[in-house]
């Protein structure tokens, strides 16, 4: 499969890229730091620069891709949540997702899947038991961030009947 990945140098993306390459998939990584990525990642991975916010030369690869895995986002545990840091956390998810959704909308042969990885923090504090998709949302900054992130994906809900996640 031809898979486009954002956030491929992060906590989830790094190990995932290794597995995808080992499984024989063609990987195109969109990254803010191409030189750093090239020095650390498998040479089979095609690396394309991306500012994480707007469409760029990478959009040509969306046409004909089988899937887009959007793992990009400011580290939520890396710094204190000041007003500026909260804007970075939200913007890194929402702006990039909007650019990806727009590029998918323009593709002649659209990917079958767009996967956005969010976190269990959406559900707030859970004292006991398991958390499933139908669990009530939390009332926190992370819950609101995920709401905005889902909203950025929502245009695809009307164009792709395979979209499984609805607005919370």
Region spans (language model):
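NAD(P)H-binding glycine-rich loop region in Rossmannoid oxidoreductase-like domains
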Residues: 35, 39-99
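Rossmann-fold NAD(P)-dependent oxidoreductase module
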Residues: 15, 19, 103, 152
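Active-site Tyr-X1-5-Lys
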Residues: 139-166
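Residues at the starts of beta-strands that form the adenosine-phosphate
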Residues: 2, 26, 113, 162
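Conserved glycine-rich Rossmann-like NAD(P)H-binding loop of the short-chain dehydrogenase/reductase
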Residues: 25-32
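N-terminal Rossmann NAD(P)H-binding glycine-rich loop of SDR-like oxidoreductase domains
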Residues: 3-23
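Conserved Rossmann-fold NAD(P)-dependent oxidoreductase catalytic core, especially the SDR/UDP-sugar
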Residues: 86-88, 97-140
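SDR active-site strand-loop-helix element
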Residues: 6, 30, 71-72, 114-120, ...
């Amino acid at each position: 499969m031809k898979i486009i990945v954002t956030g491929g140098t992060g906590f989830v993306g790094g190990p995932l890229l290794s597995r995808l390459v080992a499984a024989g998939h063609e990987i195109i990584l969109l990254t803010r730091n191409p030189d750093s990525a090239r020095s650390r990642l498998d040479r089979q991975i095609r690396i394309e620069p991306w500012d994480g916010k707007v469409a760029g030369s990478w959009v040509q690869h969306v046409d004909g891709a089988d899937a887009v895995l959007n793992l990009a986002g400011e580290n939520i545990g890396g710094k204190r949540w000041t007003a500026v840091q909260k804007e970075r956390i939200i913007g890194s998810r929402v702006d990039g997702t909007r650019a990806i959704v727009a590029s998918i909308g323009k593709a002649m042969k659209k990917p079958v899947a767009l996967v956005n990885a969010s976190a269990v923090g959406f559900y707030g504090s859970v004292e006991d038991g398991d958390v499933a998709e139908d669990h009530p949302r939390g009332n926190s900054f992370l819950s609101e961030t995920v709401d905005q992130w889902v909203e950025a994906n929502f245009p695809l809900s009307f164009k792709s009947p395979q979209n499984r996640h609805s607005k919370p």
